[in-house]
From Swiss-Prot:
HAMAP family, alphabetized: UPF0434
Family as reported in the entry's similarity comment: Belongs to the UPF0434 family.
UniProt GO cellular component terms: cytosol
Organism: Methylobacillus flagellatus (strain ATCC 51484 / DSM 6875 / VKM B-1610 / KT)
A Pfam entry, by short name: Trm112p
Residues forming coiled coils: none
Protein name: UPF0434 protein Mfla_2088
Length: 60
């Protein structure tokens, strides 16, 4: 994932910062508790495509 792209991407819902999880290939929004997938190196920034993080899953 390109570092410059990570700097400008924000959560489409709350406009908050995203955190890159390399192993899971996801961008995490901590306040919304959503994980946006990265497919073929392209972040899919659609709310309908995001995975809701369960309460028990730790958000780094």
């Amino acid at each position: 994932m390109d570092a410059k792209l990570l700097e400008i991407l924000v959560c489409p819902i709350c406009k908050g910062p995203l955190h890159y999880k390399k192993n899971e290939q996801e961008l995490i929004c901590k306040p919304c508790r959503l994980a946006y997938p990265i497919q073929d190196g392209i972040p899919v920034m659609l709310e309908d495509e995001a995975r809701k993080l369960p309460a028990e899953e730790e958000v780094e």
